[in-house]
Amino acid sequence: MPKIRHLAIVCMDPEALAKFHCEVFDMKVVERNGRQNVFVSDGYITVALLSQKAEGKPCGLNHFGFQVEDSAAIAERLKSWKVVGPAPRPPDRAYAELRATDPEGNNFDLAEGGFERSAARGGRKGAPATA
């Protein structure tokens, strides 16, 4: 059964927002990367706090990610919905293999290995293990 495993939020100050999530919700910082992004987790769901770099673009939800057992089966289900994707994610985005949109244009990722596979490949080292 697919499970939501991460959310990505575009924000003006990822460090300040990470501090908020850690102090208010007891989340833990699991990674910072060179793009000024901060990743926090409650041990199950990871929230990617992404630095806003595009002038005039809104902050808010960027995408959400599902961990799935069989991405090909999900891709087959998506065909009848006439949505964009799924398309392969760039190789430097090790935490998800595919990206698609829902019928209203909201982006979502599909990952068979999720953050656990990414940690094994050298990314998201502190992210929670998959369920």
Question: Language model features by range: what are they?
Answer:
Residues 28, 48, 83-87:
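A short linear hydrophobic-aromatic micro-motif
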Residues 1-16, 61-64, 114-131:
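N-terminal beta-strand motif that seeds the catalytic metal site of vicinal oxygen chelate
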Residues 2, 8-47, 53:
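Core segments of cupin and vicinal oxygen chelate
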Residues 13-14, 64-107, 131:
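Vicinal oxygen chelate
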Residues 3, 34, 60, 94:
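Exposed loop/turn and edge beta-strand positions of beta-sandwich/beta-sheet ligand-binding modules
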Residues 33, 55-56, 89-93:
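A short beta-turn/loop motif at secondary-structure boundaries
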Residues 110:
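Short glycine-/small-residue motifs
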Residues 40-43, 100-103, 113:
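Active-site beta-strand termini and strand-to-loop segments that position acidic
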